[in-house]
Amino acid sequence: MQSAFGAGAAEVIVTDGGSFDRTARLAKSAGARVMLSDRLRSRRLNHAAESATGRSLIFLHADTRLPAGGVAAVHEALDDGAIFGGFRLRFAEPQTKLRVAERMINFRSAITRCPWGDQAQFIRRDVFRQLGGFRELPIMDDYELALRLRGSGRSRILPQTVITSGRRFLQKGLWRTAWTNWRIIAKYHAGGDVEELAKMYRR
């Protein structure tokens, strides 16, 4: 949240799905607008986007930090013809295995033009509304949005880097996590049940 203001955001909306910590209070004290919403992430993001007033939207996970000048970089990309995109990614933790994971993720997004949610997806607000926002899925909502926009030829991966948490890779292991992610992607494309995919992700 602080990184969003530091990156130049004029409006920061925090969606709280019923947390029991001090998230809402801290967000308000920092100058953000707080919305209490559903626990389903895609629905929370859609509610926040509906109330946003800017011409562009940046969806920032709680454990992801925007770089200085990140908002200006988004506006520049949108002014240059992009309608959707994300940033390169770096993990906050120092472990060597995370450097490998970063390279894999950044290579994947550069090739596919499908940034995931932890890469701070951005989109023109009018385009987001025309598309009907995120599909209300328990998982893959960020990937599904990226897939819909990839065919436009106007998706952009910015050279600037967001910092995010690598705790999932550290807790579950690099190759196990990567293998699980690719299995979920493959099953999603094969028409797998998203509720089952969400369970697979949480295991």
Question: Positions of the model-derived regions?
Answer:
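Short, acidic, metal-binding catalytic loop of nucleotide-sugar glycosyltransferases
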Residues: 1-9
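A conserved acidic beta->alpha catalytic loop
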Residues: 3, 16-24, 64
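Glycine-rich, basic loop-to-helix element that forms the pyrophosphate-binding segment
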Residues: 29, 36-52
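Short aromatic/hydrophobic "clamp" motif used to bind/position activated sugar donors
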Residues: 57
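Acidic donor-binding loop at a coil-to-helix junction in glycosyltransferase catalytic cores
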Residues: 139-145
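Hydrophobic helical membrane-anchoring modules
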Residues: 147-203
